[in-house]
Amino acid sequence: TYDDADKVLFSADAFGKFGALDVEEEWLPEARRYFIGIVGKYGVQVQAVLKKAAGLDIETICSLHGPILHKEQLADVLAAYDTWSAYRPETDGILVAYTSIYGHTADAAEQLAEELRTKGQQVVVMDLARCDMAEAVAQAFRFSKLVLATPTYNGDVFPFTKTFIEHLTERNYQNRTVALMENGSWAPTAARVMRKMFESSKNLTILDETVTVKGSLDDASTAQLHALADALSKC
């Protein structure tokens, strides 16, 4: 609802955020998590609403779930919503999201992250079995590249990774580069399963370079890791 007398947009669920209203904090991080978690699937509809809002003289936004947003904030807020709803990355960087049973996949993920940092890449590493899943999903949408590292589990992927990918695909994850790392001592199949999970996703580039660890890193898988780091730093 728009009040043209006071130039206030009462935006219902839009432009909200998680967190307490009596705490001064940056709007963007919790607004990102709120948008991706609740509105992320409906980017096309949000783009349509933003086009309508562009024709209004808005000085204040009052949402149902968040602080009152004033005129000096609105340019940044609207720009963020445009980026999120168009499924564009906010930041040129890499999220390395892993699950690990005995620690070897975690070691490989951390080693990749460190090598990427030496190549000048901005990297965040998250353990999907221990972090806030909603925050991991938000970070995947924030960054331009995603590395998924997981053991093979019952011929599939480890459950936390499977849930994570499902959260991404049901929110129309797109316009990103994805790289895959798998671990399995005798029949590693996780990379193939993950690739299949993204089959219906639009505008995803899944790199050909894949790291296959059989138990723990050896010379062969370390060479694959170096090749993946090179590919990620160049794309």
Per-segment meaning from a language model:
Residues 1-25:
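Catalytic core of the metallo-beta-lactamase
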Residues 18-68, 111-126, 136-235:
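FMN-binding flavodoxin-like domain, especially the glycine-rich phosphate-binding loop
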Residues 78-79, 126-131:
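Short gly/ser/thr-rich secondary-structure transition/capping motifs
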Residues 13, 98-101, 128, 182-183:
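Cofactor-binding loop segments of dinucleotide-utilizing enzymes, especially the Rossmann-like FAD-
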Residues 62-90:
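Short N-terminal or domain-adjacent regulatory/targeting segments
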Residues 1-9, 50-53, 133-136:
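Short amphipathic alpha-helices and their capping/turn segments at secondary-structure boundaries
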Residues 97-119:
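Short, charged N-terminal beta->alpha structural module
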Residues 2, 9, 93-97, 179:
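Conserved beta-strand elements of the Class I
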